[in-house]
């Protein structure tokens, strides 16, 4: 009984986070799809049939039944998939990196468009009250978005528990509105028959095919189901989809279609015009709340994706702020929030209406779905051990469908869809350059590493100036496992603290690391030890807290107080070589050197959660 209550609770929570994006698509999807073609029963049934089978095949079958199998120890998303691939393949790792970082860039671009189109489409409902209110749509939507991004720093912990019930109210509302229309014109239920979808595509030809770009809007947000596995689990998400989101969405789409059959003029805003006039204002309020929640879910997912990228070494250690002491998943990334805000506002001000935004929306998500399909297909062969025939048949079907959508979406590239794609390339270049630079640094430190034991003997450890009562913790970065900061300190000061701990952290290719696998320790001397701390890519790196737990568990051979110990971090000064090898490498080196110089000691201190008043930065120099 308790297990069922827990599942229902997670399912309700999933409604508010996972289905906000796909759940608000009825605001604009049918309007965009049917605009430009005759509003008659044949066309309406054809479009509704395409919507029905798109939701069944792409979301219900592909994502919930197949893609869900490719989780990484309970975590989903394209970067979690990358970490899983690193376990299983070395041959194709460079390709996986390129695919994953480009996919991550596409999701960031989507994070700008989704809040814009969702909020604007909801506020456009004011036009149903009076034409005089249309000029106020953009200012009101902009104000809502400004408030939304401004409040990110405070976190959503206090109101987050309301998201599920509020989205449930949204789904119930749109379902009832749809049922009322279907009851009057049940002929729309014929659209469940795939014949109408096929007949529509055959009859309309090229124009019908291009309308698939509008149909694709009903499945945007489906990628969020896979990305949010770790937050809620597979079964609660499936339960929420099949018993709440899917039936409510279909009822509303079919209700809009039923209304359009008898009132073709309702195409100006088919979502709001299925409601009675007295319900317009309450519906606008409910829709606006739902779109804000959907936007919040996208923003939070982008923050989570950024955290994964930082921990996997795909981007610099930008500041990540924990907004909740109880829930590690509630984070705020100031720089990403600012980028999303600027991008979202730029889209709103440039495109002005939901129709215009829809002509730029979808192509980035479409490409990301294709990349996930390809990676999961490889996982099916290498991890699940499916036969080549089964993989080619099933994923060939998925790729065929996604490529068909992509072909229909290509015209969106010139109407604004190029923006998230160009942004994705830019982000991918930054990530690839960062990864390339870290690998170079790792190789450089490895080739020039020094044996600490030999150095201690050469410096006559016993004759060095002793610092009694002083405990020093030297933190080395992922590219330097030899303890370079400690060696620099010894050579410069010719003094040694009473207790020395050289700490290196490793982010494993799993979301969470069990306590029994958290620590590795090697002692070089009775007072000098090297400690490796393992983290998962979904965890928060907190060196002082991890050391405190290690002390409490008597893992270290000596006692020291973390609250009084001195921390030392290594800050490399990277310079790009003046030797020109190739233009791409040259610019990668320049970019990496710039990023390293600008992620200063302060960012390292924040990233490791070190106390500012007890941390010393030790500089090093390296030429790429």
UniProtKB/Swiss-Prot annotation:
Topology with respect to the bilayer: Multi-pass membrane protein
A molecular-function term among this protein's GO annotations: potassium ion transmembrane transporter activity
Main location: membrane
Catalysed conversion reaction: K(+)(in) + H(+)(in) = K(+)(out) + H(+)(out)
Cell location: Cell inner membrane
Secretion signal, residue range per the UniProt entry: none
Cellular component annotations (GO), alphabetically ordered: plasma membrane
Keywords assigned by UniProt, alphabetized: Cell inner membrane, Cell membrane, Ion transport, Membrane, Potassium, Potassium transport, Symport, Transmembrane, Transmembrane helix, Transport
Top-rank lineage group of the source organism: Bacteria
Pfam families (UniProt xref): K_trans (PF02705), K_trans_C (PF22776)
InterPro entries: K+_transporter, K_trans_C, K_trans_N, Kup
UniProt keyword Metal-binding present: no
Annotated transmembrane regions: 10-30, 48-68, 94-114, 133-153, 159-179, 210-230, 242-262, 270-290, 331-351, 363-383, 388-408, 413-433
Its job: Transport of potassium into the cell. Likely operates as a K(+):H(+) symporter.
Family: Belongs to the HAK/KUP transporter (TC 2.A.72) family.
Protein name: Probable potassium transport system protein Kup 1
Native species: Legionella pneumophila (strain Lens)
Designated gene of the protein: kup1
């Amino acid at each position: 009984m308790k297990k069922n209550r827990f599942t229902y609770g997670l399912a309700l929570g999933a409604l508010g986070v996972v289905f906000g994006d796909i759940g608000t698509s009825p605001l604009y999807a049918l309007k965009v799809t049917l605009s430009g073609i005759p509003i008659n029963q044949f066309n309406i049934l054809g479009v509704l049939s395409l919507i029905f089978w798109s939701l069944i095949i792409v979301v219900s079958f592909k994502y919930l039944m197949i893609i869900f199998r490719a989780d990484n120890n309970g975590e989903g998303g394209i970067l979690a998939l990358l970490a899983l691939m690193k376990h299983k393949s070395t041959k194709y790792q460079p390709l996986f990196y390129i695919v994953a970082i480009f996919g991550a860039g596409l999701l960031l671009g989507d994070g700008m468009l989704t809040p814009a189109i969702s909020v604007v489409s909801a506020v456009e409902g004011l036009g149903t009250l009076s034409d005089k209110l249309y000029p106020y749509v953009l200012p009101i939507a902009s104000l809502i978005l400004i408030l939304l991004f401004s409040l990110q720093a405070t976190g959503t912990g206090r109101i987050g528990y309301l998201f599920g019930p509020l989205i449930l109210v949204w789904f119930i509302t749109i379902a009832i509105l749809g049922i009322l229309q279907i009851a009057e014109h049940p002929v729309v239920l014929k659209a469940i028959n795939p014949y109408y979808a096929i007949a529509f595509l055959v009859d309309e030809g090229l124009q019908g095919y291009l309308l698939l770009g509008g149909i694709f809007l009903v499945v945007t947000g489906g990628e969020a189901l896979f990305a949010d596995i770790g937050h809620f689990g597979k079964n609660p998400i499936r339960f929420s989809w099949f018993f709440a989101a899917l039936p409510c969405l279909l009822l509303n789409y079919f209700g809009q279609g039923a209304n359009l059959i008898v009132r073709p003029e309702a195409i100006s805003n088919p979502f709001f015009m299925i409601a009675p006039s007295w319900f317009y204002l309450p519906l606008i309020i409910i829709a606006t709340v739902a779109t804000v929640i959907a936007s919040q879910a996208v923003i939070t997912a982008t923050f989570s994706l950024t955290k994964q990228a930082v921990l996997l070494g795909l981007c610099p250690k930008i500041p990540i702020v924990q907004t909740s002491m109880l829930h590690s998943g509630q984070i705020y990334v100031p720089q990403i929030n600012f980028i999303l805000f600027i991008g979202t506002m730029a889209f709103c001000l440039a495109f002005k209406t939901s129709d215009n935004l829809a002509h730029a929306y979808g192509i980035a998500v479409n490409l990301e779905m294709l990349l996930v399909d390809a990676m999961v297909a490889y996982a099916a062969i290498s991890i699940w051990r499916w036969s080549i025939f089964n993989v080619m048949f099933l994923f060939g079907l998925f790729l065929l469908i996604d490529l068909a959508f992509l072909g229909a979406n290509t015209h969106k590239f010139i109407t604004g869809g190029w923006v998230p794609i160009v942004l994705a390339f830019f982000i991918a270049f930054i990530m690839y350059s960062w990864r390339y630079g870290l690998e170079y640094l790792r190789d450089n430190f490895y080739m020039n590493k020094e044996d600490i034991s030999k150095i201690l003997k050469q410096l006559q450890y016993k004759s060095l100036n002793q610092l009694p009562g002083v405990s020093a913790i030297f933190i080395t970065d992922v590219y330097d496992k030899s303890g370079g900061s400690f060696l620099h300190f010894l050579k410069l000061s010719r003094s040694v603290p009473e207790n020395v701990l050289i700490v290196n952290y490793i982010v494993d290719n799993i979301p969470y690391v069990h306590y029994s696998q958290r620590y590795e320790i090697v002692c070089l001397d009775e007072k000098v030890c090297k400690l490796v701390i393992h983290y998962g890519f979904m965890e928060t790196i907190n060196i002082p807290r991890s050391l405190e737990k290690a002390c409490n568990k008597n893992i270290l051979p000596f006692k020291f107080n973390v609250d009084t110990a001195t921390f030392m971090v290594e800050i490399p000064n990277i310079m790009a070589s003046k030797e020109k090898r190739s233009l791409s490498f040259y610019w990668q080196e320049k970019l990496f050197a710039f990023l390293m110089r600008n992620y200063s000691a302060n960012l390292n201190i924040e990233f490791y959660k070190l106390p500012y008043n007890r941390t010393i930065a030790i500089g090093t120099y390296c030429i790429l």
